[in-house]
From Swiss-Prot:
Keywords: ATP-binding, Cytoplasm, Kinase, NAD, NADP, Nucleotide-binding, Transferase
Active-site residues, Swiss-Prot/TrEMBL: 89 (proton acceptor)
Lineage, uppermost ranks: Bacteria, Pseudomonadati, Pseudomonadota, Gammaproteobacteria, Alteromonadales
Organism: Shewanella halifaxensis (strain HAW-EB4)
Protein name (Swiss-Prot/TrEMBL): NAD kinase
Family from the record: Belongs to the NAD kinase family.
Length: 309
C-alpha cells in the first residue's frame, strides 16, 4: 500500500531538505523533570556554542536560566527549522499535535521508557545530532487523525491524534453500545469497553496492548481495535486511511462517554452522539539519523530475537 501525504504549507525559515542547513532550533521538554532539565541545559549550551539560534519552550525555559529565549510552542513551529523534544513518547505526542501544523522537523531525545519516537540517547546525543545538523538525516512523514464529536448534526468539539483516538466510558470501565460505519457503510454494532482507532504510529502503543497488529509507518492505513468486546467473533480490522470512520453512540448508554486523543485530550460524548474519525491534513515530519531502521527499533524496544546467522 502506498502513502500519499499532504504536507502543511511551509512557513518561512522552516522548509527542510537535504541541501539546507539548520539555523534556528527549538527545545521542548517535560517540565520539572530532573533528567530532562539536565539534557536541555546540555543541548542549549552545546547548540549555542556552535552558533545556532536556540529557542526554548516557555514551560521549561525558567529551569534553564534567565539567559534563554523563551517562546511558546506555536512560535517554535513558526520560527524553527528543527524542534528537539526531550522526554518520552508522551512528551513527543503532546508537542507533535501542535508542531504538525507547521513544516518544522521534529527529533526526540529519549528520557522516557520505550521511546519509539525518540531516537537520540540522552547521555550521548552529540555524535548523532552532529550528523543530523550536517545534513545526514532522513525525514519520515507520519499522518495524524482528526476526531470530531457531532450532536444533533452540529459539530461540538474536535482535536487531532498522532497515535490513536479512543471511544471509552471514562474513568470507570463498563460496557457501552455503539455502531461502526466505514464510508457510511454499516460494519457492525458493538458492545464493548470501547474501541481504539489507531494510526501506524500508534500501532505500537495502546492498540498493540489491546491485541492490534503493528502497522509499518509507511502504510496509508488505520486499525480499529475493539476493547474487550462482548463477543468471540469480533477482531481488529485494518482499513484504508482515506476512509471516514463513524461511530454512532447508542442513546441507551446511561452515562457520558469520552473520546481521548493520544490519552491527552478528552472530548465529551453524550448518548446519541456521532463521532467522525478521519485522516487529518496535518503531517508530522519526524527527523531520523541517516540509516534509521524501523525494524531495528521494534527488535530493540519489544525484545524480538536477533539474527541467528
Amino acid at each position: 500500500m502506498g502513502i500519499n501525504l499532504k504536507v502543511s504549507r511551509p512557513k518561512a525559515g522552516s522548509n527542510i531538505n537535504m541541501s539546507n542547513t539548520f539555523h534556528t532550533i527549538g527545545l521542548i521538554g517535560k517540565p520539572n523533570h530532573k533528567g530532562t532539565t539536565l539534557t536541555l541545559k546540555r543541548l542549549h549550551h552545546w547548540l549555542s556554542m556552535q552558533g545556532y539560534k536556540v529557542l526554548v519552550e516557555e514551560r521549561v525555559a525558567g529551569e534553564l536560566g534567565p539567559q534563554v529565549q523563551s517562546v511558546d510552542l506555536l512560535e517554535i513551529g513558526e520560527q524553527c527549522d528543527l524542534a528537539i523534544v526531550v522526554g518520552g513518547d508522551g512528551n513527543m505526542l503532546g508537542a507533535a499535535r501542535v508542531l504538525a501544523r507547521f513544516s518544522v522537523g521534529v527529533i526526540g531525545v529519549n528520557r522516557g521508557n520505550l521511546g519509539f519516537l525518540t531516537d537520540l540517547p540522552p547521555d550521548s546525543f552529540e555524535e548523532a545530532l552532529s550528523k543530523v545538523l550536517e545534513g545526514e538525516f532522513e525525514i519520515e512523514q507520519r499522518f495524524l487523525l482528526e476526531a470530531e464529536v457531532h450532536r444533533h448534526g452540529e459539530l461540538k468539539s474536535s482535536n487531532t491524534a498522532v497515535n490513536e483516538a479512543v471511544l471509552h466510558p471514562g474513568k470507570i470501565a463498563y460496557m457501552i453500545e455503539f455502531e461502526v460505519y466505514i464510508d457510511d457503510k454499516f460494519m457492525y454494532s458493538q458492545r464493548a469497553d470501547g474501541i481504539i482507532i489507531s494510526t501506524p504510529t500508534g500501532s505500537t502503543a495502546y492498540s498493540l496492548s489491546a491485541g492490534g497488529a503493528i502497522l509499518t509507518p509507511n502504510l496509508s492505513a488505520v486499525i480499529l481495535v475493539p476493547m474487550f468486546p462482548h463477543t468471540l467473533s469480533c477482531r481488529p480490522i485494518v482499513v484504508d486511511a482515506a476512509s471516514i470512520i463513524k461511530l454512532v453512540v447508542s442513546p441507551h448508554n446511561s452515562d457520558n462517554l469520552e473520546v481521548s486523543c493520544d490519552g491527552h485530550v478528552h472530548l465529551s460524548v453524550l448518548p446519541g452522539d456521532e463521532i467522525i474519525i478521519k485522516r487529518s491534513q496535518e503531517t508530522l515530519r519526524l527527523v531520523h539519523p541517516k540509516g534509521h531502521n524501523y525494524f531495528h527499533v521494534l527488535r530493540t524496544k519489544l525484545g524480538w530475537g536477533s539474527k541467528l546467522f
